[in-house]
Amino acid sequence: MGKLRIGFLTALLVLAGCREAATLTLADGEQQRLKDYRGEWLVVNYFAEWCAPCLRELPLLNELGQAAGPAVLAVSFDTMPAQALQAMQQRLAITIPVVTSLKGPWPFELPRVLPTTFVIDPDGKLAARHQGELRAEDIARWRENYWGNKGGS
């Protein structure tokens, strides 16, 4: 019975180690992992070119991405080749990295509403979700509650 239990536990550990990592692909083809952002706050925004509220909030996200604080990623809901996505990024003046795909176990589900923004804490866990257009006061509240004076990156 002891050997069977040890064998079972060993198999579980092996399978746990095989679990797919949370990864992303940027519009320029660069591959990254969620764990690359460990130790810092991460804001992940889902947008689409046809979504008017998404386009209105892009300047706020660009500004947030340039400020000291969280890393910011924009995930395109539009399915298009990388070259077209890069052209859209230039056309819309998106200065934050644009993601073409997310794979593996992310700490949130695919949004049902656009725009949707997720705040991921330095441990890789979901801290906040915002459905609908972001406003400056939403970001100010996150700054105060998450990555501002309370630590974080």
Give the label of every model feature segment:
Residues 116, 120-153:
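Thiol-/selenol-based redox modules, centered on thioredoxin-like
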Residues 56-92, 103-105:
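Structural microenvironment flanking redox-active thiols in thiol-disulfide oxidoreductases
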Residues 15-35:
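N-terminal "domain-start" segment that seeds a small globular fold
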Residues 34-55:
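Short active-site neighborhood of thiol/selenol oxidoreductases, capturing the structured segment around
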